[in-house]
UniProtKB/Swiss-Prot annotation:
Record feature DNA-binding region, as residue ranges: 180-239
Function of the molecule: Sequence-specific transcription factor which is part of a developmental regulatory system that provides cells with specific positional identities on the anterior-posterior axis.
Biased composition (Gly residues): 107-119
UniProt protein name: Homeobox protein Hox-B3a
Organism field: Danio rerio (Zebrafish)
Length: 417
């Protein structure tokens, strides 16, 4: 019965409608395939300790079913539709196979129904192959478990010792797992001294020098590279903190160059407001500057009253020799050349420093008292009122000399006071 049904199936479906458990169709003729199936059936029976199913093995369905039997021997967890009991003796299994094929045979007995039954048999074989393949792929063998555990142990073991972390854990294991578990490298003082020395000379190492230092310090190249990266970041951080500190409390070291600029700005505004230069000026010079501002306010009105004096911005170069030959000869041409504040008489209104000595008030050379200074300022203002346009050269002399005096005369003031 079994042989006839199997041979009828093979003749009806032409020997190529069935698919093996691996999902490929078999186009070979039936006799050659019978031999291979016979060999496989014998091997699988010997492997699974099956009883003999007969001398002639059925061609293709038996091949698929023996594959299923092989899978059931490896792992007896197939779906209940093909194997209702989990572990079945082979004769019952062959009876089930024959019964399923016999039920498919009447459907294909008609002339046109062969294709339909072939489709159903294909679907059944496909379902059987799909049922066997997931069980085969889902099965986890012990060597797979061992290899995964070994790799995990390899990844976690370098964290125990720093030497392994330097060699294998840092380079071979993935960075995400190793970075969190890698031990902190402890550098000796000698290594740190050498690294700091090298960093002092050049902050970026070339690779030959890095290899040389690695051999010299018994460190890995990776450690030296990472140390230099961290050291550069620390250096940048220190530079930023220094920059912030110098900008906040910084006018003390860096303020000496800007002070002349501030003073020049104050001198430019001195014709309009008295308080502009008082702030940057040192407290010891407050008296002379206040006196000078008194003079500036005294001169301000005659300037407004005398229209020809509006040319004073252009006239100082013409009257520079006269001013240098004037009463303050000790602040001569070197001072004028040495002061960058004076540029072509642009800061003509910067007059407030030691105006009395500039104007021939040599009886007040040392600014002995505020009253005398103010008297001198009023005297000069009176003179300026009498002839506002004529003594214009002397006024330009004062304005031309002052930028140099405001910077250089501070030391003589200290000695005189």
């Amino acid at each position: 019965m079994q042989k006839t049904t199997y041979y009828d199936n093979s003749t009806l479906f032409g020997g190529y409608s069935y698919q093996g458990a691996n999902g490929f169709g078999y186009d070979a003729p039936a006799p050659a395939f019978q031999n291979s199936a016979h060999l496989e059936g014998d091997y699988q029976r010997s492997a699974c300790s099956l009883q003999s199913l007969g001398t002639s093995a059925p061609p293709q369905p038996q091949h698929a079913k023996t594959k299923e039997l092989n899978g059931s021997c490896m792992r007896p967890s197939l779906p209940p539709e093909h194997h209702p009991p989990p572990q079945v003796s082979p004769p019952q299994n062959t009876v089930n196979v024959a019964a399923t094929n016999a039920t498919q045979q009447p459907g294909g007995s008609g002339g046109g129904g062969g294709a339909g039954s072939g489709g159903t048999s294909k679907s059944s074989s496909k379902s059987s192959s799909m049922a066997t393949n997931p069980t085969l792929t889902k099965q986890i063998f012990p060597w797979m478990k061992e290899s995964r555990q070994n790799t995990k142990q390899k990844n976690s073991s370098p964290s125990a010792s720093s030497a392994n972390a330097e060699s294998s854990g840092g380079e071979k294991s993935p960075p995400g797992s190793a970075a969190s578990k890698r031990a902190r490298t402890a550098y000796t003082s000698a290594q740190l001294v050498e690294l700091e020395k090298e960093f002092h000379f050049n902050r970026y190492l070339c690779r030959p020098r890095r290899v040389e230092m690695a051999n010299l310090l018994n460190l890995s190249e990776r450690q030296i590279k990472i140390w230099f990266q961290n050291r550069r970041m620390k250096y940048k951080k220190d530079q930023k903190s220094k920059g912030i500190g110098s900008s906040s409390g910084g006018p003390s070291p860096t303020g000496s160059p800007p002070l002349p600029m501030q003073s020049s700005a104050g001198f430019m505004n001195s014709m309009h407001s008295m308080g502009s230069y008082d702030a940057p000026s040192p407290p010891s010079f407050n008296k002379p500057h206040q006196n000078a501002y008194a003079m500036s306010t005294a001169y301000q009105n005659p300037m407004k009253g005398c229209p020809p004096q509006q040319k004073y911005g252009n006239t100082p170069p013409d009257y520079d020799p006269h001013g240098l030959q004037g009463n303050s000869g000790n602040y001569g041409t070197p001072n004028m050349q040495g002061s960058p504040v004076y540029v072509g008489g642009n800061y003509v209104d910067a007059m407030p420093a030691t105006g009395p000595s500039m104007y021939g008030l040599n009886h007040l050379p040392h600014h002995q008292s505020a009253s005398m200074d103010y008297n001198g300022a009023t005297q000069m203002s009176a003179n300026q009122h009498h002839g506002p346009c004529d003594p214009h050269p002397t006024y330009t002399d004062l304005s031309a000399h002052h930028p140099s005096q405001g910077r250089i005369q501070e030391a003589p003031k200290l000695t005189h006071l």
